[in-house]
Amino acid sequence: MNWFTKLLPKISTANKKGVPEGVWHKCPSCTAVLYRVELERNLEVCPKCYYHIRLDPRKRLAQFLDEGEQEELAEDILPVDRLKFRDSKKYKDRLSAAQKATEEKEALVVYKGNIYGNPIVAAAFNFFFVGGSMGAAVGERFAAGVEAAISERLPFVCFSTSGGARMQEGLFSLFQMAKTSAVLARLAEYKLPYISVLTDPTMGGVSASLAMLGDVIIAEPNALIGFSGPRVIEQTIRQTLPEGFQRSEFLLEHGAIDMVVDRRELKSTIASLITKLTHQPPPDLPVEESV
């Protein structure tokens, strides 16, 4: 330090205040920076490009079911590492990491609640838990939810988002395709409606079983739906796939699903479908939500 700098007055600068974490969210599609409160009010749909941001199951069911009496079902059914499976990491360590990151015990949550006053059973997958994969506990939770619907003669709704069967459980995970299909056949015997909602992504063994067995199959816009992913298919057939292949709009155009519905309209749409399928009076919808 020279004599000149010693003569200069010291200038204090105000501490720079950072923006609190979680106030803003960047859209994964258009990269617009969105105010978190406004985004949540819009049900996690980007107001700029209408991209449907992935939801955890509790947030999804909180948006879907009426406030008030809600009962979680089958939460005591937990995953078990029967095969002592290990790839680059032990399966039990993967489970522990997923449980810590998501604060959930498994990749499926099941609730009994109401939709515009009408009781239903609803299930939702968690893509943030081991890719929403279906293992023995997921299949058992799903079956328990359907059995509860049968017992109380209620409609059943499932929101799927999954990479498929959980490879760390081997054949035990593949058994769940048959189990979930069989229990849904029982639901159909009682003439109780099953509404399947496909969200991004719904792939593999889940898409090949419970996801495509709905009396009405609905998809959120631009959801990736299929068995193998498009990159795997292109590498196998050595051809470029059509634009939009395996997206919900493509599947609707080719008759694989029944409807593509914006998330903000799902509750009113499903409520109307259920009343039609169960021969009940139309639900008392708010004016802005009427379909």
UniProtKB/Swiss-Prot annotation:
Keywords: ATP-binding, Cytoplasm, Fatty acid biosynthesis, Fatty acid metabolism, Lipid biosynthesis, Lipid metabolism, Metal-binding, Nucleotide-binding, Transferase, Zinc, Zinc-finger. GO terms for cellular component: acetate CoA-transferase complex. Pathway: Lipid metabolism; malonyl-CoA biosynthesis; malonyl-CoA from acetyl-CoA: step 1/1. Component of the acetyl coenzyme A carboxylase (ACC) complex. Biotin carboxylase (BC) catalyzes the carboxylation of biotin on its carrier protein (BCCP) and then the CO(2) group is transferred by the transcarboxylase to acetyl-CoA to form malonyl-CoA. It comes from Coxiella burnetii (strain RSA 493 / Nine Mile phase I). The keyword Lipid biosynthesis applies. Pfam families: Carboxyl_trans (PF01039), Zn_ribbon_ACC (PF17848). Its cofactor is Zn(2+). Binds 1 zinc ion per subunit. Belongs to the AccD/PCCB family. Acetyl-CoA carboxylase is a heterohexamer composed of biotin carboxyl carrier protein (AccB), biotin carboxylase (AccC) and two subunits each of ACCase subunit alpha (AccA) and ACCase subunit beta (AccD). It is found in: Cytoplasm. One of its GO terms (molecular function) is ATP binding. It is an enzyme of class 2 (transferase). This is Acetyl-coenzyme A carboxylase carboxyl transferase subunit beta. It comes from the Bacteria. Gene3D superfamilies: 2-enoyl-CoA Hydratase, Chain A, domain 1.
